[in-house]
Amino acid sequence: SDDLPWCMVPEKKLTPEDVKYVLSSHYQGTPYDPYASYGDKSMKGAYRSIGINRNDFVALIQLRPDLPADLQAVEWVAYASNALNAMVPFYANVETTPAYLAGTTGEVSTDSFYWVSRMIAAMADASYGKSVFHVERYELGVLSACRALLNQYDACLLYTSPSPRD
């Protein structure tokens, strides 16, 4: 539409959480929200939202210039619908990844972050109004744990690094 802005300059530096929020948008609080239980039903879905249930993967790179070069880049990854998933971070220079996060199989399993994300999204999408509170708590819990792990490992890696700054 010609009425929608193509781009905007942010008022502050964006965090991975900010980007995730935008990519999860489904016009919350407007008549166009496909999950809304209020308003004119003919308006729901009038505009296609970014955070739809047909998303399957999102990744973004966070560059942290205040850290040494080998720790600067973190890739944040999430599977399933952006409105119903949780991002996890990966250092760019790792050689192995825990099995739960590393891969998946063709068989649905709770032993895989990929399949757990897909199952949560599928169940929550069908009952969004009753599920969104739980999904948001899960997303914030995962994010909080991931931020704590990043802080812990950044400190550990900085302490053991032969040169504190590049």
What are these model-derived regions, one by one?
Residues 1-45, 49-53:
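Long, internal scaffold/assembly segments composed of regular secondary structure
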Residues 159-166:
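Conserved small/polar residues in nucleotide/adenosyl-binding loops
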Residues 39-41, 45-154:
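Substrate-recognition/cap regions that form aromatic- and gly/pro-loop-enriched pockets
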